[in-house]
Amino acid sequence: MGQKINPNGFRLGVIHDWESKWYADKGYKETLNEDLRIRKFISKKLKDASVSTVEIERAANRINISIHTAKPGMVIGKGGSEVEALRKQLNALTDKQVHINIVEIKKPDLDAELVADSIARQLEARIAFRRAMRQATQRAMRAGAKGIKVQTSGRLNGADMARREWHTEGRVPLQTLRADIDYAWVNAFTTYGEIGVQVWINRGEILPTRKNKPASKPTKGGNR
């Protein structure tokens, strides 16, 4: 099962959290579509800012958006001008009060979304796919990854037949729920067609915290 399902969804509620946090008694479809519009708008607006994840929280008529990026300076702008302009645009898009929080990604080489996007951009620039995969795995291992797997599929190097190639280093245990596996799939649009890039990164194990039980008090009169 761990080999087929999305590793991020497989670990939801265990070691990974949801990217949208809200509850709706009614109007669920409209709220979900609004989340999709927000993410699409931010992805298009900040396509060169190395944005990995957009988390959305809702409370009453307020939307809190956390943008995880490896280039916070580009998102914020001089004196906060860029992020303020983005906030006003999202206010107009949603007709709600929007608050934006910028979260810096300290190690972009351990973020599957950013690694996959980097490989896809290299493929679009006609870089050899094996070289792009090898360099990505080497950077991830140097950054502290326990393992990484990169897969590309499509008409690689303009071949007539579509095929699949992958490069792996270290361990990537997909069925171990405590293993912090980050996964992403990005498409590269080349002159030969669309090439899919998938990345799995093992960032180590997250052990569940043990809750200490309070010591039981002795019963009145002692043991009998």
Swiss-Prot record:
Tree of life domain: Bacteria
Gene Ontology MF annotations: mRNA binding; rRNA binding; structural constituent of ribosome
Keyword Ribosomal protein: yes
Entry-linked InterPro entries: KH_dom, KH_dom-like_a/b, KH_dom_type_2, KH_sf_prok-type, Ribosomal_S3_C_sf, Ribosomal_uS3_bac-typ, Ribosomal_uS3_C, Ribosomal_uS3_CS
Pfam family, one: KH_2
One GO-annotated biological process of the protein: translation
Keyword Ribonucleoprotein found: yes
Record-annotated KH type-2 domain positions: 38-106
GO cellular component labels: cytosolic small ribosomal subunit
UniProt keywords, alphabetically: Ribonucleoprotein, Ribosomal protein, RNA-binding, rRNA-binding
PROSITE patterns registered for this protein in UniProt: KH_TYPE_2 (PS50823), RIBOSOMAL_S3 (PS00548)
Subunit details: Part of the 30S ribosomal subunit. Forms a tight complex with proteins S10 and S14.
HAMAP family with a match to the protein in the record: Ribosomal_uS3_B
PANTHER family: 30S/40S RIBOSOMAL PROTEIN S3, SMALL RIBOSOMAL SUBUNIT PROTEIN US3C
Family designation: Belongs to the universal ribosomal protein uS3 family.
NCBIfam families documented for this protein: rpsC_bact
Function summary: Binds the lower part of the 30S subunit head. Binds mRNA in the 70S ribosome, positioning it for translation.
Record-given protein name: Small ribosomal subunit protein uS3
Organism: Lactobacillus helveticus (strain DPC 4571)
